[in-house]
């Protein structure tokens, strides 16, 4: 069964998450994450007459081409990232947390990190693994190192959910 990507879900997620991170007070990692958010916003708004959904699709294609060309890493880094997040969050074993909701949060974080990377690739014309490291590090320092921020962040992500969790599948396509 093929599921057609729905870039509207990804675009909505990107807009919600960048808005959330830009509203936080400055702390460790904020300047670096903001640099990549600004890159993403530049790429998504660069061409008049092209929808943000189309730009999301374009930058994802740029990233896919670069990953395919990278003989050493390919998709391993991103696969390992999502596997690490599943392990770190003890998915399915968190008391008082619906496993599907926890998985949605992991997938939303993964999709946002991947889109920030895709924007950097699109703007530079090449994949820099230092950028991936910077994005992951700054994202986690902004979203995970303060329990109140993490709770608010998860609440903010919930605004993108459609309620039936099908949007999670679109984030993975």
UniProtKB/Swiss-Prot annotation:
Keywords: Bacterial flagellum biogenesis. It comes from the Bacteria. One of its GO terms (biological process) is bacterial-type flagellum organization. Required for the secretion of flagellin and expression of motility. Belongs to the FliB family. This is Flagellar biosynthetic protein FliV. It comes from Salmonella muenchen. The gene is fliV.
């Amino acid at each position: 069964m093929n599921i057609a990507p729905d870039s509207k879900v990804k675009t909505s997620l990107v807009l919600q998450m960048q808005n959330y991170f830009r509203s936080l007070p400055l702390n460790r990692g904020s300047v670096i994450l903001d640099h990549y958010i600004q890159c993403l916003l530049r790429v998504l708004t660069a061409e008049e007459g092209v929808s943000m959904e189309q730009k999301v699709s374009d930058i994802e294609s740029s990233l896919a081409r670069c990953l395919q060309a990278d003989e050493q890493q390919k998709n391993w880094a991103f696969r390992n990232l999502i596997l690490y997040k599943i392990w770190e969050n003890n998915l399915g074993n968190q008391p008082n947390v619906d496993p599907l909701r926890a998985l949605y949060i992991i997938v939303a974080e993964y999709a946002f990190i991947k889109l920030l990377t895709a924007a950097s690739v699109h703007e530079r014309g090449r994949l820099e693994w230092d950028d991936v490291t910077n994005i992951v590090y700054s994202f986690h320092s902004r979203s995970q190192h303060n329990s109140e921020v993490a709770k608010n962040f998860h609440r903010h992500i919930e605004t993108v959910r459609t309620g039936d969790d099908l949007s999670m599948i679109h984030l993975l396509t």
